Every structure is written in C-alpha cells, then in structure tokens.
Amino acid sequence: MNIIQSFTHRLSDLIKQYPLAMSFIFISTAFIPWIQDESISRDMIVVLLLPIYFSTVLLLNKRKYANGLAIAYAILITLAFYFAERPIYDNDAYWGLLLIHFVLFVTYPLAKENRLFVYNTVSRLTQLALAIVLAGIICICAVLVLNSIEYLFNINLLSYRIVPKTLLFIMCFFTPVFFLIFEQRLAQNFQGERFHYVIELIVNFIFSPVVILYTLIVYLYLAKILFYFELPKGGVAYIIMPYIALGLCCQGLRLLLIDAKWTGFYRVFAYLSIAPLVLLWVGIHTRITTYGLTEIRVMLVVLASMMTLFILFSMTQRLQQYRLFSLTACLLLFISTILTSPYYLAQQHQLARFERLLSELNILDEQQQISATIFDSQFAKQLSSEQVEKYKQLEEIIGGYIKTNPVAVAKYGQEKLNYLHGFYYNQIIYNTPYQDEEASITFYAYDTRRQDNYTIDIAPYQTLHLINGYVNSGDPNERETQTQETSTLFQRQFDLIDKHNKYSFDEHYFVEVFKAAGLDIHQKYSQDTLLPLAKELTQVPTREGGLLIFRDMDFKYEVHGDIKGYVYQGGYIEFYLAP
C-alpha cells in the first residue's frame, strides 16, 4: 500500500507541475480500450500522436503562451492526420514528424556549449531508456498476473483483444509518467552531475579503438581501389556510415570524460573522414545506378547528407555546435518526409528507370507505347540472357512503383503493365523450353486476386472434420516420382487415414478438371491459363462420397519419356466434409 500511496502522491505532484502533459497522457490512453480492428487506422491516431503531444509540451515549457500553442498544435496535427488519405501508421509525414520531435526532444534545450549539449542529450536518452524499461517490466508483470488469474480461476483473460490493449495502455501511460519523474529528479540534482567510470571505459578503450581500426581498414580499402583502378562496391555505404556515426558519437561523448584519450586522433577525425565520405557517396551512387532509388535508399541519402554536413561543420570552430547538428537533421527530415516523401521520390526515379529499360529492350512502338509484340507466345523464347535480366528488373520495378503511379498507368495502360509485371515468371521462367523437366505451380483455394465467390454446397454432407495437415503424393523421403510408378501416373489412388476417418481419392479427378476447362493435363500452359482451375482442383471428391477441402495444392510438370504432364505433388488439407 505504501508503494501505491507513494506513486499516487508522485502522480499528484506531476499533475501540478506538468498539467498539460499529464492531460495529454490521460486523454490519449483513454482511447485505447475503444480501439476496434475495423477502424484501427482512425482509432489509433490520438494514441500514436501521444509522443508528439508530449514532446511539444516539454519543448514549449516555460515559454509564453506555451499551453495555448501546444493545444492548438495538437488539434492541428490531429485533424491533418485524421483527414489524410493514407493511414497514420503508413504515412511518411507522421514518421518524419515523429523523428523531428524525437531529435528536438532528446537535444532540448539546444545548449550552445557543446559539453552541456551532450550532457543534456545523454541524460534525456538515459531517462527515456529507463522509462521504457520500467514500463516493459510492468508489462511483463501484468501478463504474469493475467496468466495466473486465467490458470487459477479458469477465466479467459489472455484474449487477443485484452492483452494487446493492456500492454499498449501500460507502455503509453507509464513511459511518459516515469520520464517526468526522472525529469523532476534531474532538475533537483542538476549540479551533482557525475558520469560513471563505465562510460569512460567504453569510449576510451572500446569505441575509440574500433573507430581507429575502421579508419585504417577504410584507407587500406581506398589504397586497393586506387591500385587496381576499380570502383568501390555499392555495399560500402553500409560500412562507412556506421563508422562515421560511431566516430561522431565518440567525439561528442569525450566532452563528458574527465580523462579523455586519443585526443590527437579526434583532433583530425573530421579531415580523416573526407576520404571515407567520398567512398560513401560513390557507393551510394553505384547502388542507386545499379538498383534504382527505393525508400530505404532515399533515407540513406538523407543520413549521408546529415553526416557530410556534420563533418563539414566540425572543421570550423564557429560551426561546431551540436545544436546546429540537431537543427540541420530536423530540416533534412522535414524536407524528405513532410515536404515530399521517400516513396514519391523513389517512384519518380523508378519511373525514369522503367522507361529507360523499355527503350533498351526495344519494346516501345513509334507512339512510345508498349508494343503488342510482347503478347506473342514465342516472344519470350527469343530473348538473350542479358534481356532476360532486364525483364527481371522490370518485374521488381513494376510491382513496387509503376502500377501505383497514375502517370505510368495513364501513359502505358493498366492491362499492359499487369502483363509486364508477370512477364518474367509467367513467360520467361515458366514457359522457356529449358524448364520442361521441372515446372511447379501451386493452386490456392483462397486467392484475393480472384473475384469469384467461394461457396461450397454442404447439403450432401453430414459432418465437417477439421484436418489441418499436409499430405504428399508418396513417401516423404521420395520426392521424385519413381520410374516404376510412371506407368500409373494420372491413374493413381491416394488413401488417407486420420484418427476419425479413412478416405481416398483418385488422381484421375485432376485430369477431368483440366478436360472440363478445355485443357489437356499432358500439355504445358502458362500460369495465367492454369490458375483459374484452383477452385475445382482444391475441392476433391472422395470415393466414400465425401469432399476434401485443400488450402493449397502443388503440381509439377514432369516428363518421363512419352508420359508427361502436371503431376500431383501434395497439398494442405483444411477440412473434410463426410457423407
């Protein structure tokens, strides 16, 4: 009880000292119990915006008209995301705004003196980390309590609705509350700052030697490039960036140390970083030129720009202010995520790459439209290996960026884009003569791409049995059809037994499904031709008069001398309707 009373008293003090921040916490967490699955994108807005509300109040603390500005800002961004076209959790502007607030929040109050700036940042990050850890511990305790109650009293508490909402409430309520408690204590003991010896040990004897070793490795790699006169690998960007980030981090943390080592190295670190930065940008350029711009690579460019500016600022005493680093990072994030978006930038770049590939493949007609020659059944078999690789690139581009680009759809047509999207697998990989020996296809009973109404007439059956199990066409250790079995292909009988039923079905049923669709199971077809058979193939009648309902079913086009065709490999049975 003393703990509860102490926490209640502490909560009362927080409400008096931070009334608006606590109000936002109460309001946002009050929405959590009412979140519904079907309207989660709307119901979660106030909850997901809590970090922004909370940080805004603390950033404006002790400013004139702080409460009014914070409330107005909160209402404005809430309405903006409520009426936005994309759900808040899928909106680049939300994540960009969240990152900007995070940077400003942990670097508050943007102290001009670098040592104080680093101290404030480390202190806030430590407070935030401890608050999250404590809230996480409460989450674990809550789950243990709910589990105990459920086990002892046979009360179903651990439902998929209760537990997630409970944990979300705990994290959203206790994390900011614990942070405010730490903030109170820090304000009361500011003059007594002292950092543990462990930080000095980590910076002086672990991180700094790693940075120096990385510097040596990077310069050796640079010497290798110059010696062999070759371009750096595209992946070098993912090596250089952590190295420079760690170096900048150590350079800042050294300001907090009483006995900082490696002073000479860090005095010239900014100048030593110039060559790695050049490698970084060459690597990024190589990566983008080869694979195109994606959302991740847009953010890679943003991060590389930040680090480049930070290094340049570090070269002059006047600009080497960490608050300037913080504001620069916020500006770049604002430009890349709110004024525009990584997806939009990637989409525009990939459209240019798409059109360049179309020209290189020579499939544009005189009107600069996609030529009808791609629909020729023999077209794919005439392609060179270099052209095949370019069609593979088209496959990757179209699905992620082109089919959702209204400019591309208006210019080239949805039908041709859809056809090109599946061209690599359907027409090249699947239909090439080199694949006749082994071509697999999976039929899915429930496919969102099909518009048909999936219904089953259950009148002829008495009971439904849940199976949920995978069965294959033979011995699981014998994946290939044995030579002695080839004479009976398409005439086999499969006997299945479980603890409730015994049932069997004939392979000849699949032959009849093909025939009913005007197809020959012994001939090879494109996937687009075969996939409409999925509904009939996954509803298999048994000899006992029942019906097996498959979730998915695998076939492979096999060739055994004169005997060839789509051979049943196995499938996942969900239900059995017994007569």
Curated annotation (Swiss-Prot):
The keyword Transmembrane helix applies. It is found in: Cell membrane. The chain crosses the membrane at residues 13-35, 39-61, 66-83, 93-110, 130-152, 162-181, 201-223, 238-257, 264-286, 296-315, 324-346. Keywords: Cell membrane, Membrane, Transmembrane, Transmembrane helix. One of its GO terms (cellular component) is plasma membrane. InterPro entries: DUF4153. Signal peptide: none annotated. It is a multi-pass membrane protein. Its main location: membrane. This is Uncharacterized protein PM1469.
